[in-house]
């Protein structure tokens, strides 16, 4: 099988991106030139080869250390785990090109927010979010209403104006979690999922969807998690969220035939419902599995009412 790093280099070069394989902070990475060679982006391919959890966790620890060093020196890298590349290749390739400056532009001011059904959210997130849909109570969609300025002219020239009315982003939120602070009840909601079309750079989309949810539900606060495989969560800070705690890494079992990623706790629960297994069995290698431990996440909270 071709190495993941070679697959990425080949794909970027096929799309006109000048890149090279280099060493950064102990990792073999792809250094891609963007903005006509004026700057570069670091891509970190993550081969999934661990045949037990100890190896997977050790790899994750070393990866986290290297990513921290790379971030300080070159900016946060683009991290591409092998299972994502093989199982969700179309989405991953589109997102990778978007990071390289190859994208369609849309602005939230030219879009409208609508409530959508759970089924609509499920389909969109299955196609455009790394983890797909998760249980949510409130589902919102952002629909393209019009193009303006140079974007409109570009769409007309490329005969792409027919995507007006298209669903281009989705945000979902949980039901309320309630607790009492002093003499008042606080209602907190989780921002569960957000995704936009991977080939489109959407300016202001997250903010517009969040404002619609706040206007409808009037929460006391909204919390969410930034997936550290994608970013450090700067977009949440720009929306007024405050960083809180780190979310621990999650262990996954990977089926190399399908590259499906299954959390170890789910795998163990499914097994133990059929047969009684000793606790340590959940960490024993299956002969047909690889293991991967992700980078965890960072928790963010937006407080909309004054409480301690």
How would you describe each model-predicted region?
Residues 83, 91, 95, 100-220, ...:
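A conserved beta-strand-loop-helix scaffold within acyl/acetyltransferase catalytic domains
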Residues 34-61, 176-177:
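Short beta-strand-loop-alpha-helix junction that forms the active-site gateway
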Residues 225-287, 293-307:
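Active-site/acyl-donor-binding loops of N-acyltransferases
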Residues 55-87:
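Catalytic cores of nucleic-acid endonucleases
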Residues 1-22:
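Acidic-basic catalytic patches of nuclease active cores, encompassing PD-(D/E)XK
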Residues 72-75, 218-222:
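Short, high-confidence coil segments that cap the C-terminus of an alpha-helix
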Residues 18-33:
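A short, well-structured beta->alpha microelement
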Residues 31-37, 143-145, 302-304:
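Active-site beta-strand termini and strand-to-loop segments that position acidic
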